[in-house]
């Protein structure tokens, strides 16, 4: 299966807190496209923004990834398959996967389900702070 054949049917899949949240989706993409197994995260029964913020901030998996500095003019220099933490203001509350050849971030949001967006589109939709992480 080609990369395009894998990605195309995912677009538009719905978000689901217990089974298809942003982390579960990032794990799926990392496993299928990049052969990386990321740990599963047990989520509480009820959606809690506070829980999301704390889980992203404190999860030990973050130690296995290196933050990538922005290139000149804010260009993305991260490797293909980098994790992308997204924040509206200061604290990350969402995660996606950088697809370098497509110059897009694929992610699964509560509002839109699975979508593949440019950095500019993400910033225009309110994700003002994007931080890229390459695996160690």
Question: Which role fits each region the language model picked out?
Answer:
Residues 44-113, 136:
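...with weaker cross-activation on analogous glycine-rich loops/strands in unrelated enzymes
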């Amino acid at each position: 299966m080609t990369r395009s054949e894998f990605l195309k049917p995912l677009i538009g899949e719905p978000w689901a807190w217990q089974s298809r949240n942003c982390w579960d989706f990032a794990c799926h993409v990392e496993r299928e496209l990049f052969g990386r197994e990321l740990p599963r995260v047990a989520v509480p029964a009820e959606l809690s923004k506070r829980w999301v913020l704390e889980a992203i901030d404190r999860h030990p998996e973050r130690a296995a990834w290196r933050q990538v500095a922005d290139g000149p003019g804010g260009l993305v220099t991260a490797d293909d398959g980098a994790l992308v933490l997204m924040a509206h203001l200061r604290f990350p509350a969402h995660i996606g996967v950088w697809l370098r050849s497509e110059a897009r971030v694929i992610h699964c949001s509560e509002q839109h389900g699975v979508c593949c967006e440019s950095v500019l589109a993400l910033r225009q939709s309110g994700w003002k702070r994007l931080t890229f992480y390459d695996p160690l």
